[in-house]
């Protein structure tokens, strides 16, 4: 009896220590660092892609890339899931006009903590570029229709 309790307690400790390490993503989404991601092949404008992401899952937005590890994960996800991407794939970064001052922030409202620009230009919406293995950010016209990645 004592051995059963000891083994049961040990299994409970292992379960509890592992239960917080991955996001609780549905089967069609991929998990990385506690967040869920899904790449979509259909082409949408930046605004339509952002709207689509918010309707997919509670807390969903276009992807916010906050580290080089996350950039590598997203690039790999795009390469796996969106083989038809011609030039670029939308991410959640966009220039916002706030009280006549332009600020760049992620569509989920978070500030930029990691940067990976190809070059800064005057266009307002950003995507990851195919020529860089979908790792570098580049400005594109917001009305272009392209694939995208959602994050929750």
From Swiss-Prot:
Transmembrane segments: none annotated. Expressed by the venom gland. This is Snaclec anticoagulant protein subunit A. It comes from the Eukaryota. One of its GO terms (molecular function) is metal ion binding. It comes from Deinagkistrodon acutus (Hundred-pace snake). Anticoagulant protein which binds to the gamma-carboxyglutamic acid-domain regions of factors IX and factor X in the presence of calcium with a 1 to 1 stoichiometry. Also inhibits platelet aggregation by binding to platelet glycoprotein Ibalpha (GP1BA) and functioning as a blocker of vWF. Is devoid of hemorrhagic and lethal activities. Possesses antithrombotic and thrombolytic activities. Also hydrolyzes the Aalpha-chain of fibrinogen. Does not affect the Bbeta-chain and the gamma chain. The keyword Protease does not apply. Disulfide bonds join 25-36, 53-150, 125-142. The keyword Lyase does not apply. GO terms for cellular component: extracellular region. Belongs to the snaclec family. Heterodimer of subunits A and B; disulfide-linked. Residues 1-23 form the signal peptide. Keywords: Blood coagulation cascade inhibiting toxin, Calcium, Disulfide bond, Hemostasis impairing toxin, Metal-binding, Platelet aggregation inhibiting toxin, Secreted, Signal, Toxin. It is found in: Secreted. Ca(2+) binds at residues 64, 66, 70, 151. Residues 24-152 form the C-type lectin domain.
């Amino acid at each position: 009896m004592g051995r059963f309790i000891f083994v049961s307690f040990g299994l409970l400790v292992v379960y509890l220590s592992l239960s917080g390490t991955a996001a609780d993503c549905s089967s069609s989404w991929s998990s990385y660092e506690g967040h869920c991601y899904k790449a979509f092949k259909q082409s949408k404008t930046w605004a339509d892609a952002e709207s689509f992401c918010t309707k997919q899952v509670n807390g969903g937005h276009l992807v916010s890339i906050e580290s080089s590890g996350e950039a590598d994960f997203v690039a790999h996800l795009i390469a796996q899931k969106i083989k038809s991407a011609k030039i670029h794939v939308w991410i959640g970064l966009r220039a916002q006009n706030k009280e006549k001052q332009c600020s760049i922030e992620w569509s989920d409202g978070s500030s930029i903590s990691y940067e990976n620009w190809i070059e800064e230009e005057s266009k307002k919406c950003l995507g990851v570029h195919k020529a860089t293995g979908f790792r570098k950010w580049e400005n594109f016209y917001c009305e272009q229709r392209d694939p995208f990645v959602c994050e929750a």
